[in-house]
């Protein structure tokens, strides 16, 4: 994984609007950060500390503190378990962008997340691995379902158009439990894609549990995998808010 987008929330947590404001890349042996047009489109956004110019390119041989601080320190005793929760091997040294791409750099009640832009895998498929969102809001019955689930359990998606916080929300349920309760939600960055994929009549979506981490925090409790054929002409992360701000400052000044 060589690049991630940074999403920021404008407004309060319950009703805030999320959108991309920057892009983090690994280029050869250094890291690069640039702001995207979303940084000018989201009300209230201000530049991150240490990266004050929205039109600058920032490069570093080490991961920028804003993102490095969202990784669990290797010296922590729970670090090997932390790797396993995300599907990595305990003794491996995964790339920090790969870890952030799975954990999304999430912190409780935070206004910042990172996410990868989906790209076709080696088989030309749409394939994403991610932690289920919203588990902390699941009912007691849903929490019990999660505790009883095994790796490989099949999941299904249902649009939740009436969701008061996000009309694009995609709720997640266990496929083989009739009248089962909502377990959580797809990550925001996948919800719009999922609706597009579900609209493809010929597309078969395989959505399964990869790991259940009963010893992990709730936001890392359920690791999922979503896979389906890549639709013809499908190009995620192409809207204006994803485009780089670099090079637009002269046009704004004109």
Locate each region found by the language model.
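Conserved active-site motif detector
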Residues: 1-254
